[in-house]
Amino acid sequence: ILCNHVLEHVKDHIQAISELHRVLKKGGTLIAQVPIDEKLETTFEDNSIIDPNERSRVFGQYDHVRIYGNDFLSLLNQSGFKSKGIQYANKLSEVEIKKYCLQKEVIPVAIKS
């Protein structure tokens, strides 16, 4: 399953992650990309922020409901996945990264065991 920048829009992301785990066959792979602020130890949510401009400032986009922290892989593991972060861009040259317009982000890969 490829879940590319979806979970930050979902109100109950824990339920969504559990559902992804449920529908994935044993040994299947989930790639779940989300915006991660590496300066945050834990994921941040604040439902009291309703102004679109303030949401953009805090969460990076007006329609996001959270900004993930370094605990994202733990959130996946709590739902039964075995996950790790892969830095694919580190395997490429700077020329390739620019050519393909890649970001140097960690790609969360989770396996259903």
What residue spans do the PLM features occupy?
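A conserved beta-strand element that flanks and buttresses the S-adenosyl-L-methionine
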Residues: L2
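S-adenosyl-L-methionine-dependent methyltransferase catalytic module, highlighting the catalytic core
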Residues: K11-S113
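A short His-aromatic
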Residues: H5-H9
